[in-house]
Design a protein with these regions (language model features):
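N-terminal hydrophobic targeting signals that begin at the initiator methionine
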Residues: 1-2
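Bacterial N-terminal signal peptides
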Residues: 6-15
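Solvent-exposed, well-ordered loop and adjacent helix/strand elements within mature globular domains
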Residues: 19-139
């Protein structure tokens, strides 16, 4: 019985690995934070934001995807017009690849944390995006 449980657990882990698509993308990383006095810090859909969350363009990265930065992993739960319009990439990109980059807005609990992270990391970086495989998940 114990062997069966271990085998089933191993198969589930393998299935999870097979059901995820992984891609790398050049991204312009911006930061945002909980604004003092605003009461709540919720995503566009009401999800309470925490430091493991980020905003993305849902046409390029599906909600629920994991975005892997060099120092952390975030879940795509939020969006915004500047992310969708890629304003930061178009404004700050010096090379064509930078101007074509996606924009990911990483959430932090405070302004100090957000600005400290932004000052110590490059504006453009390659991130890994792990998206669930819709076809396998929708069987």
């Amino acid at each position: 019985m114990k062997g069966l449980v271990i085998a089933v657990g191993f198969m589930l882990l393998l299935a999870c690995q097979l059901s995820a698509n992984e891609q790398s993308a050049l991204a312009r990383i911006t930061v945002y934070w909980h604004r003092e006095g605003s009461g709540e810090h919720a995503a566009w859909n009401g999800t309470r934001l925490c430091e493991e969350h980020c905003a993305i363009d849902p046409k390029r990265i599906p909600y629920g995807s994991k975005v892997v930065f060099p120092d952390a992993e975030c879940v795509a739960v939020d969006t915004g017009p500047d992310v969708v319009n890629r304003k930061a990439a178009l404004s700050y990109g010096r090379k064509v690849a930078e101007r074509d980059a996606i924009v990911i807005d990483r959430f932090f609990g405070s302004k100090q944390e957000a600005l400290a992270w932004a000052q110590t990391h490059p504006h453009f970086m390659t991130v890994r995006i792990l998206t669930p495989d819709v076809k396998l998940a929708g069987k």
